[in-house]
Amino acid sequence: MESFDIAIIGAGPIGLACGIEAKKAGLSHVIIDKGCLVNSIYNYPHNMTFFSTSDRLEIGNVPFISHNPKPTRPEALEYYRRVTSSWELNVRLYEKVNTVDIHSAKKTISTSKGSYEVDNIIIATGFYDLPFLLNVPGEDLPKVKHYYEEPHPYFGMKVAVVGAANSAVDVALETYRKGAKAVTMVVREPEISKKVKYWVKPDMDNRIKEGTVKAHFNSSITQINEHDITLATPEGEITIENDFVLAMTGYQPDFSFLKSCGIEIGNDEFKTPHYDEQTQETNVEGIFLAGVICGGLKTNKWFIENSRVHAEVIIDEIKGRS
């Protein structure tokens, strides 16, 4: 069994930042991820552009040079590959953490490929793995997608986009412009979210106003069939022809994993995990949280740019105890 000072669960940007700080402090580390490097970014839409400028995504004092005002997904993937190689981080990919044993002097992590004995654990798993489900009949049909990659498969198709935030708006506009036969938005709220990117929202509003993108507000899907969907709308129940449902309904952290590690989850509306905001340590001694997972269901609280500091805070705390 391999032994390390720190195990970092999650090889996203914040997990990598934690690994960098561990190396700088002379602490041995292993970064474990069930997917590929920066798996969430890899699963973003292929044509996605970040909100942040490239300098706000930098970690480890490695410059992030973008050829655009704001970096793209391919640029981010290239950047974090370069960071990982430059710092020679100890990354174990496609390795799922099965259990974490906290009931001994050293913590034991059992994975799909082996076991590790560690003094400290940093959980930086993000929130992109578990989509919020529609919980309606037919959601298990292949035509229903909770992740969107690119518009090409939807050319000539009748598409329903569920949601009203940035992802839903981007998907609706891109599929419309790349030749979808019909694009219909299904929105529970009375309007498109005011939090949609300021340079995109007017475009979406105008497409709805002119009718090139149809929108049903205060509405929800109640049934999904192979060739149509049923909606509950203020005017009553309607059925429309449909080839694909793109459910951009958001994602949530894996609370079951946190609980299996002994971490307490709050009773607040966001199910915020219990941790000390001064040290990032949870109620379990030696287990820390970093990145977006700290916000629980409030997934818009922490981003790469404002949670990079978690890495330094955690490693300083661990180093101060040794």
For each predicted feature, which ranges?
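Rossmann-like dinucleotide/flavin-binding elements
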Residues: 1-3, 8-34, 147-191, 278-322
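A Rossmann-like FAD-binding core segment of flavoenzymes
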Residues: 88-110, 115-116, 178-270
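Short amphipathic alpha-helical segments
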Residues: 19-21, 42-43, 133-137, 172-174, ...
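Beta1-alpha1 glycine-rich phosphate/pyrophosphate-binding loop at the start
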Residues: 11-89, 169-199, 267
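Flavin (primarily FAD) binding-site architecture
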Residues: 123-139, 252-263
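Extreme N-terminal leader/targeting segments of oxidoreductases
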Residues: 1-6, 129-130, 136-144
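AMP-binding/adenylate-forming core of the ANL superfamily
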Residues: 121, 243-246, 287-288
